[in-house]
Every structure is written in C-alpha cells, then in structure tokens.
Amino acid sequence: KPAETRFGLKAPALPHMLGATYDFLSNTYVHTHGATVSYAYFFDGRNGIHAELAYRSLESASASERRADPGTSVDIFAVIPHYERRFYIQRMGSFYFVRGGLGVNVYTASILTDVGKSREGLAAPVVSLALGLDFRVSRNLYLEVAARYIGDFASWNFGYDSEPLLANEGFFGGFSVGLRFGLGR
C-alpha cells in the first residue's frame, strides 16, 4: 500500500521501478522521436526521492535546410543518470502522482547526411526537466505521461566540423508516454 507522509502525500512502497517510454521532442530545426528505457531506485519511497538511470535513443523525423542538408538524420544514444524528487497525490480512490525532476545527462550522437557524410561528437552537460502524471493501472503498473524539456548548455563536436552538435544548441521540448513497473515489496 502507499505510505503516508507527514504532508499527507502518498508514495508506493516499492524500491525498484522499471520504465519504458516513447518520446517526442523537437526544437526550431529538428523533430525527433524514439524510446527510453529506465531503472529507478527509491532511496526514500515515502517522499519519492530516487535516482534513475535511463538509456534513450532518438532519431530525427525532419531537419531544417537552414542548418542541415535535406534528409539529415540525428541519432542520439544516451545513458542518462537522473535524480528526481516525486510528489504524490491521492484522488478519488484512483492513485496517481505528479512528478518533477532535474537531471544531468551525458550522451553521444552521430549525424548522417543524405550525401553520406557523417560526424560524431560528445555533448555535456545536458539538463533535463520533466513534469508529468503517473496513473496506477494495477498493483505495480503505472501509466506515465510526461512533458519534457532537454537543454544542451555546452556542446563539443570532435568530428566532422565545429558546428553545434545538435541544431539550435540542442534545446528540445516535447512529451513522453509509457509504462513503469514497480518491483520489490
């Protein structure tokens, strides 16, 4: 059962959670989509304090001709250490919680143009913001719907040229939908 805190909030008494989401992110020049799989460990289940490790793979659906050759694709392979504080709310007997998080991501990316040129690079640090709802579907299963913002505040490209690794300095906004499964108690 969810554990009650001194603030009257609720949290699942599950130390481990596995997640899989489908992500839609875009900025002025690039629209991306892809999947994220994650593992979260709750240090304090009562207050929703946990650390999360995720792997994210995105590919662009379109690119602007102003910043990239037509047909450019952007593949992002990410390993994302993530720390997050979760806030839980109980409503009308249907358990869900609101969550907000701040994390630092380190990822590698490769860009392949329509003429076969490729470049690779490393971008860090990246700040990831998330705010969403997790609805309880069954005892340990949750449906996650989240708004996401990813900001690349410093890019270094070790490959093809010295342009920013991602268009518009790598700032993306969008949303995710997926499932999370709790393990443990």
Summary of predicted features, one role per range:
Residues 7-24, 98-102, 172-175:
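Transmembrane beta-strand segments of Gram-negative outer membrane beta-barrel proteins
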Residues 6-10, 58-65, 115-117, 156-168:
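Primarily recognizes Gram-negative and organellar outer-membrane beta-barrels
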Residues 40-127, 135-141, 173-185:
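Gram-negative (and chloroplast) outer-membrane scaffold detector with strong preference
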Residues 146-149:
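Internal, hydrophobic beta-strand segments that form the core of beta-sheet-rich folds
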Residues 23-34, 92:
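Solvent-exposed loop/turn segments connecting transmembrane beta-strands
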